[in-house]
Amino acid sequence: MPPVPRTGPGYTWHLLRKWWFVTSFFRFFLACFLGFAAPAWVGAAAPAPIFVLNSLDGTVSVIDPATWQEFKRIPTGKEPHHLYMTPDEKSVIVANALSDSLTFIDPRTAEIQRTVRDILDPYHLRFSPDMKWFVTAANRLNHVDIYRWDGKDMHLVKRIPTAKTPSHLWIDTKSTTVWSTMQDSDELVAIDLPTQTLKWRVKTGAMPADVFGTPDDKTVLVGLTGGEGVEVYDVTGKEGRLIKTLKTGKGAHSFRALGDGRHVLVSNRVANTISKIDYQKMEVVDRFPGPSGPDDMDISADGKFILLASRWAKKLTVIDMASRSVVRQINVGKSPHGVWTLDHAPRQ
């Protein structure tokens, strides 16, 4: 293994891991020889791994952020596209769209916990904030499924036919409404979660993909993969109303909030850029590089780095937001899509 550079984010993670080993030994010494538990600060946790879903390989690449090396590759099912953490934070669920299954993985050890089958075409997935509902979008089969979550298992309550190619989901903070984009019929639909009924549908621009709701539940943003920007909808009325279009770049696709309660990123897959949107002013305020078909993103816990799936290059790309530059690329599998780590910035 090549030596870890003595500068940059890799070296920082390296020092953190060394600190974890030293403090863990010290904690063990105190517990064994002094007969009492060490203070909580002594046992600082090691950095959690980074998970990258290789959609055309049917695997998950597991990256050690201390060395920026892939140390494990987990077989899942066919076409793992997206992943989501369980409400208790004990599992991250990988949705295998073409295998009709969910793979539960320990977010710290990267060990497979279990596989749940007969979940039809789980392309996208999401838990409601009240932790009672689990929702999937069937991209291939044209329906949205709503499951009741009991803390361990999901139970199908309603299968809702939608339109062509349900793509992404968002649930409001009150757990009352699910919004879903229809990629091939160019629509945004709203579903009432308590009654599992379709509330409204409106036409959008070309090939709507990811959807992001502002924290006040008044506005929804839709990325247009077939266009050059993001549509902004007022969702406070009886149906969604288009109020603005933000020009970001060709192939606007996936959102990730910065965690500061004000900004959200969107990847522009064709333009190979990432745009920063101020969702209070609804303006594009910054731009970052996004090489080789930028797709899903996560943000490091300190808010300094974008972790990006470069879809066409088979790489995880690390972007320093301060310098607006690519600082590292790690080889992964074919067509990387979802990317996630437990040590992330807040999602609003």
Residue ranges and their predicted role:
Residues 7-9, 27:
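Low-complexity, intrinsically disordered Ser/Thr/Pro- and acidic-rich segments
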Residues 9-10, 32:
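Low-complexity, intrinsically disordered short segments enriched for Gly/Pro and polybasic residues
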Residues 13, 19-20, 41:
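Tryptophan (W) side chains
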Residues 24-40:
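Bacterial N-terminal signal peptides
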